[in-house]
Curated annotation (Swiss-Prot):
Main location class: cytoplasm
Gene of this entry: glyA
Record flagged with keyword Disulfide bond: no
Keyword DNA-binding set for record: no
Native source organism of the sequence: Campylobacter jejuni subsp. doylei (strain ATCC BAA-1458 / RM4099 / 269.97)
Assigned keywords, A-Z: Amino-acid biosynthesis, Cytoplasm, One-carbon metabolism, Pyridoxal phosphate, Transferase
Sites marked Plays an important role in substrate specificity: H223
Name assigned to this protein: Serine hydroxymethyltransferase
Length: 414
C-alpha cells in the first residue's frame, strides 16, 4: 500500500512542504538540500537494525553488514577531514557536542565559548542549554566591528582559566583563526574544541582553513554546508581522546546508532570527496560575495562589513524596523531567512536588530552570480519599503518564476 493510501494526511503535508521548498527561496544559512541518494538510503531497511556498540564490538548479532557500512562512513570521514579518528554515531550536532564535553571535562568544570547573542550556539555554554547547566560557562564575543578580538579572548581565558575552549559559531561571517585559539588554549592549559557545524562544507573544500592540526577535538553536523543527512560527527587525531569520545557517545549518551543515517552520512561523504564538491563550495562563497556587494551598494549595514564564508549578517540598528520585521517581510515574498541578534543589540532576542542570510541552499539549486544579483536586489527592494505588501506579493510571483528554472526535487519522497 502506498503512503498516499495509508496516511493521506502526512502524504499531503509532505507534498505541501515540497511545494514550499521548490517555489520559495531558502536563505536560512544553516539549511540546505541533501542528495536524493542520501534520502534513498535513509528510507532503506537499514532502519530496522539495532547495532549497539562499534564495528567488531556489537551487543547484537547480525551486524556484519552494518559493521561494513559504519566502517566505510568512518574511513570516508577521516579522509574528508584529514584526521586519524572519527565517530559517526552522534544523532545531531548538539549530541556530538554533549559527547565531547562528557569525554574531555567533568560536570562543574569551566568552559569558554562564544556568546550566543554574538553569534555562538546554545551548546557552547548558554545558560538555557544543558552545556550551561552541567558546566560553568564564561564567554567571549565580537567587537562592535563584528570581529573576534583574539587578544580579548586571551585576556578572558587567562582570567577565567577554563578547562575547555570552544571555537565555532552559528552567525559569524569571518574566518576563524584556529591557530590563535590553540595558542590561547595552550597558555591556560585548556582543551581546544572546534565546532565547525556551519562551515564544514567549506573547510573540506579548502574554502576555509581547517581546525586541524590546531584543535584537540572537532565536531560538526553532517547537513548544513555538507548537504548530508541530519546528524553529527566527532573527529580527533589523539587516540586516547578518541577512546574517551567513543565511550562518551556509547554507552554514555546514546544507545543504538541510527544505521540508516550512518549509511546516509557515508553517501554524503562520498559526494563531499568529489571534485564537484569543490566547485559547489567555491560557488557558495562567490554567491555570498555577490549578496554582500549588492546589499552594501544598496546602503545596508553588514556586521563586519562583509563575509568570508557562506553567510551574511545584516544589522538594522540604524533602521526603524527590526530583524523580526525583515524576516516577516521577506517571508511574505517567498524568501526564508531568520532574524538574528547583532553586536550592540538593543532589542530582545525574540525581536532582534539583525537578519542572517545564507547562500548554500540556493547554490545547491544551481543559482550563480546572475541569479544572486537578482535575488539580492529584490531583498534590498523589500527592505527599503518594508511595509509594502503589494511589492512583496509582486516579488513573490517573480521569484516563483525564477525558482521554477531551478527545481531541486521532482518528488517529495525517495
Amino acid at each position: 500500500m502506498s503512503l498516499e493510501m495509508f496516511d493521506k494526511e502526512i502524504f499531503d503535508l509532505t507534498n505541501k512542504e515540497l511545494e514550499r521548498q521548490c517555489e520559495g527561496l531558502e536563505m536560512i544559512a544553516s539549511e540546505n538540500f541533501t542528495l536524493p541518494e542520501v534520502m534513498e538510503v535513509m528510507g532503506s531497511i537499514l532502519t530496522n537494525k539495532y547495532a549497539e556498540g562499534y564495528p567488531g564490538k556489537r551487543y547484537y548479532g547480525g551486524c556484519e553488514f552494518v559493521d561494513e557500512i559504519e566502517t566505510l562512513a568512518i574511513e570516508r570521514c577521516k579522509k574528508l577531514f584529514n584526521c586519524k579518528f572519527a565517530n559517526v554515531q552522534p544523532n545531531s550536532g548538539s549530541q556530538a557536542n554533549q559527547g565531547v564535553y562528557a569525554a574531555l571535562i567533568n560536570p562543574g568544570d569551566k568552559i569558554l565559548g562564544m556568546d550566543l547573542t554574538h553569534g555562538g550556539h546554545l551548546t557552547h555554554g548558554a545558560k538555557v542549554s544543558s552545556s550551561g547547566k552541567m558546566y560553568e560557562s564564561c564567554f567571549y564575543g565580537v567587537e562592535l566591528d563584528g570581529r573576534i578580538d583574539y587578544e580579548k579572548v586571551r585576556e578572558i581565558a587567562k582570567k577565567e582559566k577554563p578547562k575547555l575552549i570552544v571555537c565555532g559559531a552559528s552567525a559569524y561571517a569571518r574566518v576563524i583563526d584556529f591557530a590563535k585559539f590553540r595558542e590561547i588554549a595552550d597558555e591556560v592549559g585548556a582543551y581546544l574544541f572546534a565546532d565547525i557545524a556551519h562551515i564544514a562544507g567549506l573547510v573540506v573544500a579548502g574554502e576555509h582553513p581547517s581546525p586541524f592540526p590546531h584543535a584537540h577535538v572537532v565536531s560538526s553536523t553532517t547537513h548544513k554546508t555538507l548537504r548530508g543527512p541530519r546528524g553529527g560527527i566527532i573527529m580527533t587525531n589523539d587516540e586516547q581522546l578518541a577512546k574517551k569520545i567513543n565511550s562518551a557517545i556509547f554507552p554514555g549518551i546514546q544507545g543504538g546508532p541510527l544505521m540508516h543515517v550512518i549509511a546516509a552520512k557515508a553517501v554524503g561523504f562520498k559526494f563531499n570527496l568529489s571534485d564537484e564538491w569543490k566547485v559547489y563550495a567555491k560557488q557558495v562563497r562567490t554567491n555570498a560575495q555577490v549578496l554582500t556587494n549588492v546589499l552594501m551598494d544598496r546602503k545596508f549595514k553588514l556586521v563586519s562589513d562583509g563575509t568570508d564564508n557562506h553567510l551574511v549578517l545584516m544589522s538594522f540598528l540604524d533602521r526603524e524596523f527590526s530583524g523580526k520585521d525583515a524576516d516577516l517581510a521577506l517571508g511574505n515574498a517567498g524568501i526564508t531567512a531568520n532574524k538574528n541578534t547583532v553586536p550592540g543589540e538593543t532589542r530582545s532576542p525574540f525581536i532582534t536588530s539583525g537578519l542572517r542570510l545564507g547562500t548554500p541552499a540556493l547554490t545547491a539549486r544551481g543559482f550563480k552570480e546572475k541569479e544572486m544579483e537578482i535575488v539580492s536586489n529584490y531583498i534590498a527592494d523589500i527592505l527599503d519599503d518594508i511595509n509594502n505588501e503589494k511589492l512583496q506579493e509582486n516579488i513573490k510571483q517573480e521569484l516563483k518564476k525564477l525558482a521554477s528554472n531551478f527545481i531541486i526535487y521532482e518528488r517529495a519522497m525517495f
